[in-house]
From Swiss-Prot:
<dbReference type="GO" id="GO:0009086">
    <property type="term" value="P:methionine biosynthetic process"/>
</dbReference>
<feature type="binding site">
    <location>
        <begin position="16"/>
        <end position="19"/>
    </location>
    <ligand>
        <name>5-methyltetrahydropteroyltri-L-glutamate</name>
    </ligand>
</feature>
<keyword id="KW-0479">Metal-binding</keyword>
<dbReference type="InterPro" id="IPR038071">
    <property type="entry name" value="UROD/MetE-like_sf"/>
</dbReference>
<dbReference type="GO" id="GO:0032259">
    <property type="term" value="P:methylation"/>
</dbReference>
<dbReference type="Pfam" id="PF01717">
    <property type="entry name" value="Meth_synt_2"/>
</dbReference>
<feature type="binding site">
    <location>
        <begin position="442"/>
        <end position="444"/>
    </location>
    <ligand>
        <name>L-methionine</name>
    </ligand>
</feature>
<feature type="binding site">
    <location>
        <position position="495"/>
    </location>
    <ligand>
        <name>L-homocysteine</name>
    </ligand>
</feature>
<comment type="pathway">
    <text>Amino-acid biosynthesis; L-methionine biosynthesis via de novo pathway; L-methionine from L-homocysteine (MetE route): step 1/1.</text>
</comment>
<feature type="binding site">
    <location>
        <position position="654"/>
    </location>
    <ligand>
        <name>Zn(2+)</name>
    </ligand>
</feature>
<dbReference type="GO" id="GO:0008270">
    <property type="term" value="F:zinc ion binding"/>
</dbReference>
<feature type="binding site">
    <location>
        <position position="610"/>
    </location>
    <ligand>
        <name>L-methionine</name>
    </ligand>
</feature>
<feature type="active site" description="Proton donor">
    <location>
        <position position="705"/>
    </location>
</feature>
<feature type="binding site">
    <location>
        <position position="610"/>
    </location>
    <ligand>
        <name>L-homocysteine</name>
    </ligand>
</feature>
<keyword id="KW-0862">Zinc</keyword>
<feature type="binding site">
    <location>
        <position position="495"/>
    </location>
    <ligand>
        <name>L-methionine</name>
    </ligand>
</feature>
<dbReference type="InterPro" id="IPR002629">
    <property type="entry name" value="Met_Synth_C/arc"/>
</dbReference>
Amino acid sequence: MTIIHNLGFPRIGAQRELKRAVEAYWAGRQTAEALHETGRALRAAHWQRQADAGVAFVPVGDFAWYDHILEWTTLLGAVPARFGHPEGKPVDLDTLFRMGRGRAPSGKPAAACEMTKWFDTNYHYIVPELTPGQTFRVAREDLFEQVKEAQALGHRVKPVIPGPLTWLWLGKGDAFAQGAGDIGKLQLLDALLPVYGEVLERLAGLGVEWVQIDEPALVLDLPQAWRDAYQAVYAKLAASPVKLLLATYFDGLKDNLATALALPVAGLHVDLVRAPDQLSDVASGLRPGQVLSAGVINGRNIWRTDLDAALAMLVPVREQLQERLWLAPSCSLLHVPVDLAGETELDAELLGWLSFAVQKLDELCLLGKALGGDADPAVQQGLAAQRAALQARRQSPRIHNPAVAQRMAGQAGVSRERAPFGQRIARQQSELRLPAFPTTTIGSFPQTAEIRALRRDWKSGALTDSAYENAIRKEIEEVIRFQEKVGLDVLVHGEPERNDMVEYFGELLAGFAFTKNGWVQSYGSRCVKPPIIFGDVARPAPMTVGWSAYAQSLTDKPVKGMLTGPVTILQWSFVRDDQPREATCRQLALALRDEVVDLEAAGIRVIQIDEPAIREGLPLRRADWRAYLDWAVDCFRLSTAGVGEATQIHTHMCYSEFNDIIESIAAMDADVITIETSRSNMELLKAFEDFHYPNDIGPGVYDIHSPNVPEVDWMVELMRKAAARLPKERLWVNPDCGLKTRAWPETEAALIGMVQAARTLRAA
């Protein structure tokens, strides 16, 4: 029998129960005990569903109230001093929430810990804060309590914990840089490893046989000092009485293969979706008795698996390893929606092409039975059904659009060039007449329950088109008047018609489909519902021109047209896997180019094309960066270069480290770039300073992910730090990101303060 297991299951719940419970607790609408009861119910349901699918060991430790890395950080007692946590006391839930979002029902508000992208995914983790001489201890009991929970329900368990070197790689501090470049972080291992040892001992004491220890850092470029550290660390952890399954994912081991194979662990998990070519080398390098966990079901996309291809790849290895070959998804299923059963509005054809977390476990079970030679006719029937679904998708006329193919054939001859920046900015300033330190926002304004109800009623047919349009126009006018009252210089229409910055555009583009309940966690309680790009992309009609033109008609101040860029739409969607991602991105760029040209023709003088996801698309290995950056930058320029020099092009990026891609950001040639910098205390600007970034820049002066209202003096100080690095005449003043998730009172207070900060700077 082939053992199948799972690296992690979506924690949010099929109906986003966790999001609702957590937000109700934050708002004081339910107690901590009620929140914990929701957590217990979700965990029990998730464990049972996995057990029903044939998972041999249910994962424990994949559940998190906010973020799984933050869970582990608090278990280690690594709480920054500003949160006022008493030394030696257990870390409570409200401290965890304050670290993640800056405030909680109890405890004083404090600056939240930094948040950034989880490798090359659209999930965000809370960055561990590291200090020289830091001490660690077991400071939370949740992991052990959840193990006992699962065991009491009759499950065999496999606790999942971040590996010590990956946790250090993810962390940073005033004295330590993020990543593997700072070997000084390795000095913390002496204090860290005894706590790992204690955790493993305690798990063994609970009867745990296997522990999954996640080390995705092993798929990255690592200095030799880090490779050496892996050997030393796991030599110490090998003394534990539990068996360690070391899990790598998101890419192949490549030049770290020898390091991984030399580690004294009982099993090794590898990603065979991203890196199938490594299978033979990994299998032949295993020690006698060592388990190979083959990640063959894609944990990051939603298409059905080609089980025939998987079997062809695995059969020779099965013959070699026998029962030592385990099967699993490529990575945690955190990155896909929970269950297709909730999709009652997708057509049957498209539904037959898809696989969410629950279905992926069923695929895994079927694959395991087929690989083990199960003679049950249902196995062959299941394989035949899978085969038929894949064939139907390949042959569907919905996939290919001849007009798109014709345009793609000629896209190489479409201009990507605009006039030089100096010439453009002079023309723009003569027309826009903006003051020094011009103020703006990133695009969205608070989405109230009333706005969400408007969209919901309109989509359900309860509201007529004309009634909906009138209501949205009213919302836009209120946002315009509010911005005028506050004193902002470049306005936005507030995006009341948009539920999501990607889904909105996908609904208006050909080649997209949308789920009813296909939610995945982005950060904390924030969930997103990625569109599905299943076929060729085209723009049947203008998407934003009507709303933007109406907003501009209400004011003499410039109103930004707001678009999501081609790379971000690509990155934040579930993308077809039957052609290169680059080709799909160029199709998106051509569609957006048409929209940009139409906005200019409608009198919109400032157009923002957001690309917050451009960095997350980077391959994990630096050797692969150039090819990606070349086509990503080219797609942005393809989408923006159809307008004249008087039209000002903005772009926005968030959660980004810019140092290593600053040349490519400059090559995008946006007139103004706005970035998230407040949580990093403006340290991101060093890249722009060192590079002598030539265009305008708006460093975010307050963190919109926290409900805390910033002090005016604090924002002034941040901008003075920015002005010390960059010419002040090229600086804009803006929040870190859009204001969609914030409430109106804090938004008004923050923007009034931000405008006051800009006026203080002008008067200096």
